[in-house]
């Protein structure tokens, strides 16, 4: 069976796809994120496995129409929800080229050019971190893999025999630390590494939602006294819920004092390194032993494009290197085999999209993007401060805003967590109902919030104003009273327009 087509058919199908992609990109400034609520019907696909083929042009047209017309479009400029960006067009071209060439990055002898491009991209970003001497690292599928790999490196660094002999050789329970707001991939990693999820010590946060360093040090002392083995502290640069950035210099001092590995999860926030104006927000990141960074967040890369960066190439190699008799070993003095510096084995070339975008647009394009999105978020914050309905529930550090409704008609002392959670979920449901825009719910330091963020490079002031108008309209339609018209209630009753719909309950964060 020949899966190829003749040149004429290949060109026809390629042009057909390019036409769809071009129309899609051209529509993104005003394209709705998803169909309206009444049209979101997604029955299971029940067709049988095809025994014979169909016309490729018809099949391609059908799936393009289905995905574009009925899909959920995170590239839309109106997508103001999670950390999912509008991809650059150069990234789309890079992904197409990689799919065609299919380089295998496990072994250097079969990926010399691809591996050189990847190593160069790693070096570029590592130098932005502040590591001028031999920054090393590898592309990953995202922050989950990068954090898992960093914890494996930390174990290898602190307990050199653990990779060969296992956790039992340590002789005591290894423990590591992160804030209550740190990413939940750390819990998953603790389980996958065999540490057990209880090995992750979640430390409370301060008023700025940063890891509380006093309580961190107290927890370390307590664990040492009980015979446990602290091996890593994870500082977060840009939490998912609020964008908070931990105090990296102070955490580094604690790491130095107790000889503990410092990992910075900068999956989102480390992108500020591309901005001279804002890189100070992650001051001290150069002191980290390893860094997680996801270009598929703020750098507008399509999935998957994660990075694990380190200033300890020897520990990276010690953690992941294995002898493999059926693969040729990379010659001494050249680049390492990627399988020996990564949790992955066979893998695609995830670096080309970032490399190509940087070659075409340069660092300064990202600097302009980051600076502009910070200005949009700051303007949004000022609107919230003057809003009749909302207030900020957390400091705005990066282009993420946490909104708390204050115009409920319920006295603050009687507005419990459940009521607030349901009201917020109802507002989100109302804002998202027509499909034009999309925002999300979150829980920040145990409190329900409405979460919005600026992530698309296409988002402008007009998109923010549209969201603001929609938020106000949602409050009005739900019967919420503006602060100037608030009437105290005797009992915490739900506003008249708030319905306990299944969607609202589903969207409500835990109270």
Residue positions per predicted region:
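N-terminal entrance/gating region of PLP-dependent enzymes' catalytic architecture
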Residues: 1-134, 433, 437, 453-455, ...
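Conserved PLP-enzyme active-site core in the AAT-like
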Residues: 113, 146-317, 502
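Short loop-beta-helix segment that forms the pyridoxal 5′-phosphate
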Residues: 125-153, 201-204
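Short Gly/Ser/Thr- and Asp/Glu-enriched loop/turn motifs at secondary-structure junctions
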Residues: 133-134, 394-399, 443-449
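A short linear hydrophobic-aromatic micro-motif
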Residues: 135, 388-392, 436-441
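Active-site C-terminal subdomain of aminotransferase-like
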Residues: 239, 258, 283-388
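Conserved PLP-binding catalytic core of the aspartate aminotransferase-like
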Residues: 391-431
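PLP-dependent enzyme catalytic core of the Aspartate aminotransferase-like
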Residues: 441-511
């Amino acid at each position: 069976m020949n899966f190829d087509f003749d040149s004429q058919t290949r060109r026809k199908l390629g042009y057909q796809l390019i036409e769809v992609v071009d129309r899609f990109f051209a529509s993104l400034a005003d394209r709705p994120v998803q169909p309206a609520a009444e049209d979101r019907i997604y029955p299971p696909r029940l067709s049988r496995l095809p025994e014979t083929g169909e016309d490729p042009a018809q099949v391609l047209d059908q799936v393009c129409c289905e995905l574009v017309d009925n899909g959920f479009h995170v590239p839309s400029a109106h997508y103001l929800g999670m950390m999912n960006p509008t991809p650059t067009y150069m990234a789309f071209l890079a992904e197409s080229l990689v799919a065609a060439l299919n380089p295998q990055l496990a072994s250097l002898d079969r990926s010399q050019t691809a591996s050189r491009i990847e190593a160069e991209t790693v070096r570029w970003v590592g130098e932005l971190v502040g590591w001028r001497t031999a920054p090393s690292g590898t592309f990953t599928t995202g922050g989950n893999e990068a954090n898992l790999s960093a914890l494996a490196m930390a174990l290898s660094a602190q307990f050199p025999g653990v990779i060969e002999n296992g956790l039992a050789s340590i002789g005591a329970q290894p423990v590591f630390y992160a804030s209550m707001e740190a990413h939940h991939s750390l819990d998953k990693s603790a389980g996958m590494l065999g540490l057990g999820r209880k090995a992750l010590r979640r430390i409370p946060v301060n008023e700025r939602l940063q890891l509380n360093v006093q309580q961190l040090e107290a927890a370390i002392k307590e664990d040492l006294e009980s015979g446990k083995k602290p091996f890593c502290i994870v500082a977060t640069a840009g939490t998912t819920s609020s964008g908070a950035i931990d105090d990296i210099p102070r955490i580094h001092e604690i790491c130095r004092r107790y000889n503990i590995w410092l990992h910075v999860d900068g999956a989102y926030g480390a992108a500020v390194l591309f901005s001279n104006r804002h890189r100070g927000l992650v001051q001290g990141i150069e002191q980290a032993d390893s860094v997680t960074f996801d270009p598929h967040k703020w750098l507008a890369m399509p999935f998957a494009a994660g990075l694990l960066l380190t200033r300890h190439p020897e520990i990276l190699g010690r953690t992941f290197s294995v002898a493999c008799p059926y693969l040729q070993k990379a010659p001494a003095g050249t680049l390492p085999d990627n399988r020996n510096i990564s949790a992955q084995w066979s893998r695609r070339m995830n670096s080309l999209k970032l490399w190509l975008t940087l070659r075409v647009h340069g660092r300064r394009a990202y600097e302009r993007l980051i600076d502009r999105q910070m200005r949009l978020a700051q303007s949004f914050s000022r609107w919230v401060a003057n809003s009749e309905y909302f207030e900020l529930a957390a400091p705005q550090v990066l282009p993420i805003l946490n909104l708390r409704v204050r115009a409920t008609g319920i006295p603050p002392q009687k507005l419990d967590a459940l009521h607030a959670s349901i009201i917020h979920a109802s507002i989100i449901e109302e804002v998202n109902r027509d499909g034009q825009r999309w925002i999300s719910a979150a829980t920040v330091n145990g409190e329900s919030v409405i979460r919005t963020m600026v992530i698309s490079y296409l988002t402008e002031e007009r998109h923010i104003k549209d969201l603001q108008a929609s938020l106000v309209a949602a409050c009005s339609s739900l019967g919420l009273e503006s602060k100037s018209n608030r009437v105290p209630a005797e009992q915490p009753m739900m506003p008249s327009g708030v319905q306990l719909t299944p969607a609202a309950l589903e969207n409500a964060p835990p109270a």
